C-alpha cells in the first residue's frame, strides 16, 4: 500500500489561489487551456454575433441617413428663407457697422465765446523734443487738462534738406509751440508740475529723457498769436515784393545797358568801314583816319546829345516917356 507523500495543506492552498485568480485569455492560450472543439464552437458563436451586430449597425445607419436627409431638407428650406430675408437684415445692420460716418471730421472750437476766451490759458513751449508730432504732444499734456488748440513752428526747410542730404532722419521736426488750455488754472498747473522735469514714461520711449520747457503766458490769448503770425506773414510778403521789384529794376537796367552798348558798337563799326573805303593812299589813309575819327566822334556825340529848344525871352519892361508919366500922374 502506497503512502501519500503530498502535503494536503499545500494542495489546499494551491486550489484557493487558483479560484481567486482572475481570467486571462493570453495565459489560457499559452497553456493550452481549451480544446480545439471548444474553440471551434466559440468561433461559430462569435461569427453569429458579428453578423447580428452588422445587421444592427446597418439598421442604425439607415435610420441615421433618414434623419440626416430630413435635417438637410429642413436646413435647405431655412437657407432659402434666410436668403430671402438677407437683404433686409443687411440694410438694417448697416448703420450699426458704420457708427462714425455722420461725425464731422474737424474738431469743434471749444473757446469761441468771450467768456470762454477769458477763462482760457496759453502755454508756450520754447523747445519741442526732436521729431515730436502735435498728436504726441497732445497725448502727453491731455491728462493735466482739456486742450483746445496746438500750434507748432516747423523747422527751417533748408536745415531739413541739409540733414536728409547728409543721411539724417527724414522726419519733420518743430522748434517751438503754443498750447491752448480750456481753463487757465490747468495751464498754470501744467507749468508748475512739468517745467524743467523729464517727460518720463516707458524707458524704451523716444522722449523718456527729454526735459519740458514750459511757460504760462499771463494775459496772452490765442487771437494774439494769430495776429502775430499774420503780421509776420505780411512782413515777409512785403519784403519778398521789395526784393522782386529791386531785382526786376536791376534786370531792366542791365538789358538797357546791353542794348546801348550794341548801338554804340554798330556806330563805331560803320564809321570804321567808311574810313577804310575813303583811304586811297598811306598819307591819305592817315589824314582820312583823323578826319574819320573826328566825324565818328561827332556822330556819336550827335547820337548822345540832344539839342534843347531855347525858350522865348521875356520882354523887358520899357520906361515910359516923361510927358506920359506927367499926364498919368495928373490923372491918377
UniProtKB/Swiss-Prot annotation:
Organism: Chaetomium globosum (strain ATCC 6205 / CBS 148.51 / DSM 1962 / NBRC 6347 / NRRL 1970) (Soil fungus)
GO annotations of cellular component type: nucleolus
CDD domains noted in UniProt: RRM_ABT1_like
Signal peptide segment: none
First-listed, main subcellular location of the protein, grouped into a coarse class: nucleus
Matches recorded under InterPro entries: ABT1/Esf2, ABT1/ESF2_RRM, Nucleotide-bd_a/b_plait_sf, RBD_domain_sf, RRM_dom
PANTHER family per record: ACTIVATOR OF BASAL TRANSCRIPTION 1 (PTHR12311:SF7)
GO BP term, example: endonucleolytic cleavage in ITS1 to separate SSU-rRNA from 5.8S rRNA and LSU-rRNA from tricistronic rRNA transcript (SSU-rRNA, 5.8S rRNA, LSU-rRNA)
Cellular location(s): Nucleus, Nucleolus
Function: Involved in the small subunit (SSU) processome assembly and function, and in the 18S rRNA synthesis. Required for the early cleavages at sites A0, A1 and A2.
Top-level taxonomy: Eukaryota, Fungi, Dikarya, Ascomycota, Pezizomycotina
Compositional bias segments (type: Basic and acidic residues): 18-31, 85-94, 292-302
Gene3D superfamilies associated with the record: 3.30.70.330
MF annotations from Gene Ontology: RNA binding
Membership in a protein family: Belongs to the ESF2/ABP1 family.
Disulfide bonds: none
Region (Disordered): 1-100, 269-302
Keywords noted in UniProt: Nucleus, Ribosome biogenesis, RNA-binding, rRNA processing
Domain annotation RRM: ranges: 121-211
Keyword Nucleus: yes
Protein name: Pre-rRNA-processing protein ESF2
Keyword Protease: no
Biased composition (Acidic residues): 43-59
